[in-house]
Amino acid sequence: MTTVRTRIAPSPTGDPHVGTAYIALFNYCFAKQHGGEFILRIEDTDQLRSTRESEQQIFDALRWLGIEWNEGPDVGGPHGPYRQSERGEIYAKYAKELVDAGHAFYCFCTAEELEQMRAEQQARGETPRYDGRALLMSAEEVQRRLDAGEPHVIRMKVPSEGICVVPDMLRGDVEIPWDRMDMQVLMKNDGLPTYFLANVVDDHLMGITHVLRGEEWLPSAPKLIKLYEYFGWEQPKLCYMPLLRNPDKSKLSKRKNPTSVTFYERMGFMPEAMLNYLGRMGWSMPDEREKFSLAEMVEHFDLSRISLGGPIFDIEKLSWLNGQWLRELPVEEFAARLQKWAFNSDYMMKIAPHVQGRVETFSQVAPLGGFFFEGALKLDAKLFESKKLSADQVRQVIQLILWKLESLRQWEKERITGCIQAVVEALELKLRDAMPLMFAAITGQASSVSVLDAMEILGPDLTRYRLRQALDLLGGVSKKENKEWEKLLASIA
């Protein structure tokens, strides 16, 4: 009997997302319920955004939750390497096989040519897609351009008509017209694969039998299915999980909810409660109980109990469930966990240099730096009153800084400062006009340790959470203001 093998393949391009943890949990439970294996693979082909720091955060977040893997970059295994950036020769080999078999082709089109192609198609009311012009080149011309070292990509051929049937374990057969599919790039001009080629090659070579992934990938499933057909490989069983959503039913995003697992760890949530809550996202126990452990979820896991309705990720409900777990702990364990959370040595070492020179006794540390150990702060609206800025300008400054910080890929003091500086310059203000607002929102005080250092230490999700909290306190942002300020944001370098 074939061993069930599932996997999670996150990209190390930022803080570990609760959506990644959600998909990892369901893959883990499915594998373990069938006595199988769970694999961790790192999709780091985006060389500009991928970092080893983010990769380590993924490891730490999953382990904090209690999700362990049988094979992966840090534990090894018989199917490595488990980082896509280390598998370049493998992808090149299989891409060349597709070209030689007539299933893929070299494309030398420049970015300017592709942009013009899209513009002309849109002007005609057509859906933008590659028009196949590279297929008109002779074999001799292709070889000449390859020999000359011209930049190129490799694209897959796709049918221009007909229907692709996607067998989904949750929805049954899903029919998707081929004319919606583009001639997907498989190998980029930097020699690295795109998601589609790497995904299929890796899943096959690593013996993945079942793929549980987010439903946002369902519309592009025909490309993956066609690649399996081209290679002559058996495709894994496919299961497209419903997406996590905000309480307003929009797709879960950091603009409306903290999305980093690290944020919830920092806020003092229990990993058992977090897993329990993620397990209830579109799934339920046979007896409908609300509180259950990872082991209990594995024991009773059944895909047929997954609901296709968009599961709502609600922090208030998560907090309620966390309280259930917290209050049922033995007092000794509660005290031990509290100590481990509050006096985490790594976190303390980040904070200590910023408070040590400002206190005379240890008892003064809490009033000065207590905000480092809090989640939501009790903010005072009076702290946001400004002699130079109107109430509307105060909200505008905070909102624009929040938006700029949301686009920040590397969370470093210098880059945080750059975001704030860019906003104040665009508004023709001084840095000293904005910093009191940052102190008020981030520390809950008029002055404290360097607020820029504090923002770096607190991390992106908690920083953004507090800025949103400040905006809510000050009355929020109207739809009209949101529209106007987003236009202004687009002009800020």
Curated annotation (Swiss-Prot):
Which ranges belong to the motif 'KMSKS' region?
A: 251-255
Q: What is its main location?
A: cytoplasm
> What is one process in the GO biological process aspect for this record?
glutamyl-tRNA aminoacylation
Would you name any one GO CC term?
Answer: cytosol
Q: Which compartments does it reside in?
A: Cytoplasm
Q: Which PROSITE patterns match?
A: AA_TRNA_LIGASE_I
Q: What GO MF annotations does this protein's record show? A: ATP binding; glutamate-tRNA ligase activity; tRNA binding; zinc ion binding
PANTHER family found in the cross-reference section: GLUTAMATE--TRNA LIGASE, GLUTAMATE--TRNA LIGASE, MITOCHONDRIAL-RELATED
Family (UniProt): Belongs to the class-I aminoacyl-tRNA synthetase family. Glutamate--tRNA ligase type 1 subfamily.
| Protein's name according to its UniProt entry | Glutamate--tRNA ligase
High-level lineage: Bacteria, Pseudomonadati, Pseudomonadota, Gammaproteobacteria, Pseudomonadales
State the encoding gene: gltX
